[in-house]
């Protein structure tokens, strides 16, 4: 979905369309009814349109005209953000930002990476050769495996103390939703490392990308990443 200033909430969630033949209204699903939704340049759309994602990202459902409809399972939203044109973008609502598990800054490719990109684009567009790498069943199985990874009481307390530190040292710290996201991300990392349990290294590796975007600081040069780094330096596993 290309997010633009004139995009409406119904353009995302769907709307009721009148069927002249049957003289009834039929619901036409919006693009949010998919397993993976890519919101391109999400901050170019006004907050009212962005709010259409809140219920979907939290409850895997959307409500239109008083009717609630479930979304496909699995359901995931991936968004890109335009940071180049600040005068033509909107600030993302805190409630929306908090629903994203991670924020990853890609930056520019280095020389070798850019040369490789140019080589891949010299012929046919890579999208023409895209092949599935996993089925829906594979994703559900992976999600179940990650959910079974053990996060001990010590690890959970470590995550909680990191979150509390951010709340005490920022205008707006990490929410309980952020703590839960950090535990889940740490479980996923442990699974990728071939372990059935989380270790502090998992938490420390995931914390910057999971917590930083949720934190708001006072003006003065520091940002969420600085607060997270400070928390990791000061808080020890007990």
Locations of the language-model features?
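Residue-level signature of catalytic and energy-coupling elements of molecular machines
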Residues: 12, 53, 100, 159, ...
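Conserved AAA+ ATPase small/helical "lid" subdomain
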Residues: 129-179
């Amino acid at each position: 979905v290309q997010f633009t200033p004139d995009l409406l909430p119904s353009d995302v969630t769907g709307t009721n369309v009148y069927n002249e033949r049957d003289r009834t209204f039929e619901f036409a699903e919006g693009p949010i009814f998919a397993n993976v939704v890519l919101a391109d340049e999400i901050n170019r759309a006004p907050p009212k349109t962005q709010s259409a994602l809140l219920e979907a990202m939290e409850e895997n459902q959307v409500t239109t005209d008083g009717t609630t409809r479930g979304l496909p399972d699995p359901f995931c939203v991936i968004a890109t953000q335009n940071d180049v044109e600040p005068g033509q973008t909107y600030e993302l609502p805190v409630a929306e930002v908090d629903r994203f598990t991670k924020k990853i800054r890609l930056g520019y490719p280095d020389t070798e990476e850019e040369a490789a990109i140019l080589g891949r684009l010299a012929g046919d567009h890579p999208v023409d050769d895209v092949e599935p790498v996993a089925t829906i069943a594979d994703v559900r199985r992976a999600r179940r495996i990650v959910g079974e990874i053990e996060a001990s009481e010590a690890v959970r307390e470590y995550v909680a103390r990191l979150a509390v530190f951010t709340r005490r040292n920022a205008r707006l710290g990490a929410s309980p939703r952020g703590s839960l996201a950090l535990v889940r991300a740490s479980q996923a990392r442990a699974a990728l490392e071939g372990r059935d349990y989380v270790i502090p290294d998992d938490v420390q590796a995931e914390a910057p990308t999971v917590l930083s975007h949720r934190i708001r600081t006072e003006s003065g040069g520091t940002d969420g990443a600085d607060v997270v780094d400070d928390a990791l330096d000061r808080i020890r596993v007990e």
